[in-house]
Regions:
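Predominantly soluble domains enriched in secretory-pathway, periplasmic, or organellar proteins
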Residues: 1-163
């Protein structure tokens, strides 16, 4: 679920209000775009929901990430470029180290790395345009005791360095 709350009177805060989410979703990783939009990633459904923070936090769109660049990107944490024209997102791997519900595999992705999303409409929409792949192959025994190589890369954190 996605919640909004005021921080104008810190250290006191207002009671959080639910502004979005969905059954079967996994809201995970958020980034503010241009001071107007909030992007909330959903690892399990490969989506980013877009909320207009200047207009009552209403949901104004959904960005579908699965497609030509990756069939199962599993977006995690995100951060925007200094000029807000791109968002960089950690994409989970096929063998997540943490946060995976084994019944639904909500944290499993097919393309571990850093996704590059081109921001459109001032932050109202975007498109996954490329991935900088990350790989860490490791040998381990399969269920029959045979040695096999498995992808173990599982990025799930990111921060854009602003100079």
């Amino acid at each position: 679920d996605v919640y909004a709350f005021g921080v104008g009177a810190l250290p006191q805060m207002t009671v959080p209000t639910r502004i979005g989410g969905r059954d079967g979703g996994d809201s995970h990783g958020m980034v503010g775009i241009g001071g107007k939009y909030l992007w909330s990633g959903d690892r399990h459904l490969n989506l980013i929901d877009v909320y207009d923070t200047g207009n009552g936090n209403i949901k104004v769109g959904t960005i579908t990430l699965a497609g030509d660049v990756s069939n199962d990107p599993a977006p995690d944490l995100m951060d925007a470029s200094p000029d807000g024209s791109y968002v960089f997102v950690a994409l989970r791997g096929p063998n997540p180290l943490t946060g995976d519900n084994k019944e639904v595999h909500n944290a499993v992705g097919s393309t571990p790395g850093v996704g590059v999303i081109k921001v459109d409409g001032g932050g109202r929409s975007g498109k996954l345009v490329s991935i900088a792949p990350i790989s860490r192959m490791a040998e381990e025994k399969d269920k029959d005791g045979n040695m096999v190589k498995k992808e173990k890369a599982d990025p799930h954190g990111i921060q854009v360095r602003k100079k």
